[in-house]
Design a protein with these regions (language model features):
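Long, ordered, helix-rich scaffold segments
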Residues: 1-229
């Protein structure tokens, strides 16, 4: 049954049908944990697709099916500054699903590569966070200490604050570190407004930015105004 879906996807010229077949295969893997029999590498042909949805679905399948042959293409998407964010996100999820030392090494090498933009590094840190939260926290702080645009720091903090283990990793790594006042304020604003309101993280951010306790009592609007100066 599942093998037939892969056959139909390969033979169909309709983008909507291709997506329907590939999505059914994706759900079968995610929900029922089953793969089609036969040659799974046939899904690789869809990595040539110009349709982002088809490409992303096929990429997720390649990762979940552990198709190492797809790895170089996925890495290239993440190295290319012109790649669409949708494709980058799918490539990261796929590499995480493949797992292994190759994935961990690739993420870290790209994060520390000075040729990559801050946007690229932020995307990669979000991926690394799912595999190595402590190392991701270390890389994130290094990025936050050198980030040119305070607003960009928000997406770094948000990635950690949404997860308890990640928040703890960032809190531990921040101890004894220094951040610019604006970056620290940005992190505090996000931490203060999050449902979990992590007090330990707020405290180390206050110390890292050299902020006085009174600034903790600023309203959200006042904090935003200070950050945007």
């Amino acid at each position: 049954h599942l093998e037939k879906l892969l056959d139909l996807a390969a033979k169909s010229m309709s983008v909507s049908r291709q997506h329907a077949y590939l999505n059914a295969l994706l759900n079968a893997k995610k929900i029922r944990k089953i793969n089609p029999s036969g040659d799974l590498q046939r899904v690789i042909q869809f990595l040539e697709s110009e349709n982002d949805t088809i490409w992303s679905t096929a990429t997720q399948l390649a990762g979940l099916w552990k198709l190492e042959v797809a790895r170089p293409r996925l890495e290239q998407i993440l190295k290319n500054k012109q790649s669409k964010q949708q494709r980058k996100n799918a490539a990261i999820d796929s590499l995480i699903a493949m797992g292994g030392e190759k994935t961990r090494q690739f993420f870290d090498q790209q994060i520390v590569d000075e040729q990559n933009t801050y946007e690229q590094k932020i995307t990669l840190i979000k991926g690394q966070l799912k595999l190595q939260p402590n190392l991701a926290a270390k890389r994130a702080i290094n990025l936050l200490q050198n980030i040119p645009n305070t607003q960009d720091s928000g997406s770094v903090f948000a990635a950690f604050i949404g997860n308890r283990g990640a928040t703890q990793a960032l809190t531990n790594e921040l101890k004894g570190k220094k951040l610019s006042q604006n970056v620290a304020l940005k992190g505090m604003q996000l931490a203060e407004s999050s449902p979990t309101r992590p007090k330990a993280l707020i405290a180390v951010l206050q110390k890292a930015g050299g902020l006085k306790a009174m600034k903790m009592s600023l309203s959200k609007d006042e904090m935003i105004t200070m950050i945007e100066r």
